[in-house]
Amino acid sequence: MTEVLILDIISIMAKKHPSTQAFSQAEVTKKYGIPKSVIHKYFPREQMRSIRARSGRRLSFPVWTDEQIQQLVRRSDIAKAIEQTRNDQAAERQRREAEALFASYSPDALIQRARTLDRAFVLHVGPTNSGKTYGALEDLKQHTPGCYLAPLRLLALEMFDKLNDAGVPCSMVTGEESILIPGADNISSTIELCDYTRRFKTAVIDEAQLIADPERGAAWLKAICLVNAEVVHVCMAPEALTYLERLVRAFDAPYTVQKHERLCPLTFSGSVHGYEDLQKDDAIICFSRKSVLSTAAHLERNGFRASVIYGALPPEARRNEVRKYLAGETNIVVATDAIGMGISLPIRRVIFAETEKFDGKEFRSLNTAEINQIGGRAGRYGMHEKGEVLVLGKDTAIGDKLGNQVRAIRAGCISFPREALRTDIPLSILLKVWQAMPRRSDFVREDMREPLSLLR
């Protein structure tokens, strides 16, 4: 690298300048790209040029011929200094570019952009099975074009089916697939695939308490800030209301709050001691595809007919599993926690076969929010007198946490902008600048220390 740099400087000299011509410091820097700091430190001041200033004073400054410069840049210490200085200057320039890039994705920048949109908000607040999403979806049916933004592919598919079944043509877009309906101007998608280029009459953002999720929360923050619709329905669990009210107020947009209550009571009914205690309309909760399939197979061998629901289930297979359950061809559901995010089935009892889950980093016990979300699927108003939550075995933690108030959300999450990876800025600089960005109490930055450590 150093030898290439020396030859590059010498070739510039040979093409443009006679060997007897002398150059000042500014000319050396401009014509040959040799940094001023290197000239100051390494270049001798033997030959001087004198000029008369307008004031009448004579000014003297050092000059160098191209022959002298060629000799100097061949010195290894000077060549290395030039290369290091250029690298440092490039890194500083890239650091400033990264800072400017991240500033454009900051909460302040999002809020400023949100203020330019003409929108009104309806904040739907309530526990699972309280009808908050139903009310928002009914408004979308009446005021199209609209978009529905889901936390899960399965939920996007469910709303896609509901809208089309109601005579509201709707397409679906998720990370795994797209189903485009000719003539449809409504769309159901996972929240990361929100279309920010369109103007809608109605937008429905579901499960907005996930704005605090360290992995995906930024998608909810961006959607709430930037989805372009006349009316934006934001559906959330109670713990998210205070934070999201404060966020929407920052937009200077009008908003109303609609509170929803469960119409079917929910109780903890203790334990079931084995699969022989299962009943019709039970949902067995596991936390992996493998566990779901093995549990369903065990039930089939013991006389039950089970439908299975998990996140990676293909759309047609999912439709068929739901159809079989609704038609009475199966009488039990075995599902992952995907069932907690709005998958609408007439379930009377939710039974936790497992009380720990792998969250991407470690196995841990279910928290209160997860227990309320999943357990809340039990009980359908008009079909069951109450919903019941049970656990397989003797674990009492589920009962201790069910129905407890979840700590209020205090901060939304900001993800490292993946658009930054499409720039020419080295990843190491991007990660360092990201980690050094100012901290805020109301927004939590995605922690990139682990990927940064892998680059060291």
What is the predicted role of each segment?
Residues 26, 43-78:
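Short helix-start
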Residues 145-156, 234, 278-299:
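Conserved strand-helix element at the start of the C-terminal RecA-like helicase core
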Residues 212-260:
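Post-DEXD/H (motif II) to motif III coupling segment of the RecA-like Helicase ATP-binding lobe
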Residues 311-312, 328-331, 337-382:
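Conserved RecA-like helicase motor core of SF1/SF2 enzymes
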